[in-house]
């Protein structure tokens, strides 16, 4: 069953944590789409699991726009938030609205000025 029991997060190293500081930070974090921005870390869900990424781990963040062209229909776009560490993309979060990705990028820059945006 999903959602039952204690909140647990996986870090960039895929190790699980469940300390009270991160649980409280997650619950108080600002939600934008499928992501949350807390004071301690950036949180997101992927395939039913919750992940946390400390802001100092993120070297670069940017938006990638993907186009989908169905047969005999107009094209539609979806937006991806890409997070990079050590030259490798480690998170690829899909959003339907560009405004959500733009808002996250703005707030990431405010929370951690060392993150390269774009």
PLM regions and their residue ranges:
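Short strand-coil-strand connectors
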Residues: 31, 45-49, 86
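Anionic N-terminal interaction surfaces
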Residues: 1-39
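Residue-level detector of beta-strand structural context in well-folded domains
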Residues: 32-33, 40, 51, 81
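Phosphoinositide-binding peripheral membrane targeting modules
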Residues: 38-70
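Acidic, Ser/Thr- and proline-rich intrinsically disordered linker/docking segments
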Residues: 2-4, 60-118
